[in-house]
Design a protein with these regions (language model features):
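Bacterial Sec-dependent N-terminal signal peptides
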Residues: 1-23
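Acidic/histidine-rich helix-loop elements
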Residues: 36-54, 76-83, 109, 115, ...
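N-terminal active-site segment of His-dependent metallophosphoesterases
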Residues: 22-87, 91
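Extended active-site neighborhood of metal-dependent phosphoesterases/phosphodiesterases
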Residues: 86-199, 297-301
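Active-site environment of divalent metal-dependent phosphoester hydrolases
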Residues: 44-46, 77-80, 101-112, 167-170, ...
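Binuclear metal-dependent phosphoesterase catalytic core
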Residues: 38, 145-147, 151-153, 244-251, ...
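Metal-dependent catalytic neighborhoods of phosphoester/phosphodiester hydrolases
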Residues: 48-49, 73-91, 108-126, 219, ...
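His/acidic metal-ligating clusters that form di-metal
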Residues: 65-67, 158-161, 173-266
Length: 333
């Protein structure tokens, strides 16, 4: 394939990457864009053990007043599934807050496929997902542009959402699934498209997904890497490293990744100039839990490769409020 045809394909892929819901995300006039991440709610509709989850969501939304909400997997893990999603998303829909979803390894285990879950999530008002272009059983792999406050037709930042699947499908390899080759290729195409469109400068970007990359463990184990927050369990990444972190570093747009999956980890650590962060467990007693539930907040800053982030807990406590990269200069060995 010659170079001209390759650019045409990349540009077309970029056009298709725009969300189809009609929602358009834009930096506010003060140059900020705030995201609330909820993760691992393990919500079971009608189960009293999930009641605290339903207290958390409106408290955080009303206190933080975000521009967007992202749910990063293992959100509804009991029947009836559709009614569970209705209950969770009602809080953001009633407040007219755009939201996106990435699925975890448990969401599809209640007799509903990932594709069926994606279908009804995309049908919700204010949802900005769309069906993934990528096959291999992954759904809602999306890139979502955030447009400029003064240039509303120009992308100013990007939000990537990835489906990290569930469990290994390769015989002899145990544990959790990994980013596929097609997902990585798709990410590189999207990143290149927006970099070319931005006069060959990578846009500031964040990536949200459920299962941590193997680099999380490497990053935290290296004491020279500055970190904030707690690690109360060993990370549970896939056993195989398919190379997504390398591609993010090489493409140069992603500043940070935000995951869930490991319920009692809430740290953020600098690894080779990319922040690797956990959200805050947002569920309650339907699974193993930390002492209190909460959410992670991120505030992007227009025109800058930096962001603020903190944890907002059910009781209103704010923890680990930091700025990346300013607060993450690595220690000397």
């Amino acid at each position: 394939m010659d170079m001209d045809k390759r650019w045409i394909i990349i540009l077309l892929l970029g056009l298709f990457s725009l969300n189809m819901s009609g929602q358009k995300l834009t930096f506010k006039k003060d140059g900020t864009f705030k995201i609330v991440q909820f993760t691992d709610m393990h919500y079971k509709h009608g189960n009293p053990k999930s009641d605290t989850t339903l207290l958390l969501i409106p408290r955080v939304l009303d206190a933080e007043k975000p521009d967007m909400v992202i749910f990063t997997g293992d959100i509804v893990t009991g029947k009836p599934v559709k009614e569970g999603w209705d209950a969770i998303t009602k809080f953001v829909i009633d407040r007219k807050i755009p939201f996106a979803v990435t699925l975890g390894n448990h969401d599809h285990e209640q007799g509903v496929t990932r594709e069926e879950i994606a279908d009804f999530i995309i049908s919700y008002p204010f949802n900005i997902n769309r069906q993934s272009e990528i096959s291999q059983g992954r759904v809602m792999d999306n890139v979502i542009p955030v447009y400029g406050s003064e240039k509303p037709l120009k992308e100013a930042a990007l939000l990537y959402c990835f489906d990290t699947g569930a469990y290994s499908t390769i015989e002899g390899v145990s544990g959790y699934d990994w980013m596929t080759t097609k997902q990585i290729e798709w990410y590189r195409e999207q990143s290149l498209h927006y970099t070319i469109k931005n006069n060959h400068h990578p846009l500031p970007a964040l990536a949200y997904f459920h299962i941590a990359l193997p680099e999380y463990r490497l990053a935290f184990n290296d004491e020279k890497n500055v970190r904030y927050g707690e690690r109360k369990e060993n990370e549970c990444p896939p056993e195989l490293n398919s190379g997504m972190f390398f591609s993010m570093k090489e493409m140069g747009d992603v500043m940070a990744t935000f995951v869930g999956h490991d319920h009692v980890n809430d740290y953020i650590v600098n690894y080779h100039g990319i922040a690797l962060a956990f959200g805050h467990f947002s569920g309650w007693k339907t699974t193993y839990t930390p002492e209190i539930n909460g959410a992670r907040i991120v505030v992007l800053k227009e025109g800058k490769r930096e962001f603020d982030t903190w944890l907002h807990q059910l009781d209103g406590t704010i923890k680990y409020k930091v700025t990346f990269p300013a607060d993450f200069a690595n220690r000397d060995k």
